[in-house]
Amino acid sequence: MTNEFLHFEKISRHTWQNLHRKTTPPLTQAELNSIKSFNDKISLQDVTDIYLPLTNLIQIYKRSKEDLAFSKGIFLQKESRKQPFIIGVSGSVAVGKSTTSRLLQILLSRTFSNATVELVTTDGFLFPNKTLEDHDILNRKGFPESYNMELLLSFLDSIKNGQDFQIPVYSHETYDIVPQEIQEVKAADFVIVEGINVFQNPQNERLYMTDFFDFSIYVDAEVENIENWYLDRFKKMLTLAENDPKNYYHRFTTQSEEEVVTFAHNVWKNINLVNLLDYIEPTRNRAEIILHKAGNHEIDEIYLKK
């Protein structure tokens, strides 16, 4: 165990799954297939073993937050204002953050009666490609400087204060922000914020993004496994782009498999791996819980902050 994990309790999958009474998952296999990322693997057994206990833990944190808000209201002699419960989900590119976030969205909406759950990805806070090109940082896309952190912090502040907020929409097909398209985010009961940068500290800012989160999750895996998943995803994206000239990945469909693999490997090595080791993984210990995935995508270990 490294010093980084000294203030985490390591829990095996077997131990974790026994922390929650066995119940039927509140979704079907078809629903699960529809929300998982196309290069990810997850089963209803994973939902039962990992995500139902996790949902129960989130329920404990939510109740604790509400109790504290009520007590502070009494102390300050004013009525406490209802706030959304904000969950941050971070981890590397291709590690399975989106699957975790979409699954939590369904589980929370069905576990808490009449609960509303919003899901936001920080991709929408990337600067448009034109802006990145103008600043000569298109090759740094995904790195801290490629995000509009001022807008992201404004969003978190507004949502935390119960105000709705409009954010830009990002397309993985065009690899860019979609012009004139917005996502209206409601100050729901739960707001899940997913992205590689959600635990990072903005440069020259006194506000930390983690200050806004009531619960935080880091999806982890060995670097070599993440690389394999990334390369697998890249090749599958090409298959989807074959008949769509507007798709960013269409340009690679005329290349040989060897050329494609070489290009994808270079992107991983020079961009995604550097970003992971320098900026994403160092924020791992800011999470409340770390879900570690084995090479078969199954979560085999859980680290819960003490």
From Swiss-Prot:
The keyword Transferase applies. It comes from the Bacteria. The keyword ATP-binding applies. One of its GO terms (biological process) is coenzyme A biosynthetic process. One of its GO terms (cellular component) is cytoplasm. It is found in: Cytoplasm. Pfam families: PRK. Pathway: Cofactor biosynthesis; coenzyme A biosynthesis; CoA from (R)-pantothenate: step 1/5. It catalyses: (R)-pantothenate + ATP = (R)-4'-phosphopantothenate + ADP + H(+). Belongs to the prokaryotic pantothenate kinase family. PANTHER family: URIDINE KINASE. This is Pantothenate kinase. It comes from Streptococcus sanguinis (strain SK36). The gene is coaA.
